[in-house]
Amino acid sequence: LWVLGEDPPENPTLRGSKVQLVPGKREYRPTDTAGILVVAPFAPAEGLLTVRRDGLVKIERVRLERRSSTIKLPLSDRWLPNVTVELDIVGAVARDNERGEPDLSLPKRPAFASGAATLKIPPKDRSLSVRITPEKKELSPGGKTRVALQVSDSSAHPVSGASLAMVAVDESVLALAGYDLPDPLEVFYPTRGAGVRDYETRLNVALMRPDTARH
């Protein structure tokens, strides 16, 4: 049996939307509780909040009653110097009609959305300050002097038993060599990636055509 005519329209596939996550601060301390503003494309919605730092470190289920809400997340000193927070939500929205416009007379279609943000937690509490006070401000070639060294923690409290290495170098030699003293905290606390790869099977969901959904 052969039938002539146009090809039937394909069923549209499900497409994800974007969730906007806005951290309340540019930087946090390890003892803070981060407030994250969530701007969702639909509500109500069920969601899964994941904290990522070289893998999953925390998973929490959330429910959004409104499109705009705030999620509280207690931080940890194990998350230095940063973590990635991702929110994946699912729900239902109005189905489009044949003209591509939302039609409330049709059954709702499934919907999903996701978004991520980075929370910076610099290791400031683990940094030390060294104050150098020379006995003499100027010296002649071959002269000698004494130098007082004071080590303080991030709260400006003196640190006892600290080990120091002091080097006296001609500043002009360093300038010619282009030497720049590196920050040791950046060496020991480099920026961490999420370390997680997501696969979304909902992208394979085929939606009913509007003419089919009416029956």
Feature map (PLM): residue ranges:
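C-terminal segments of large proteins
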Residues: 1-215
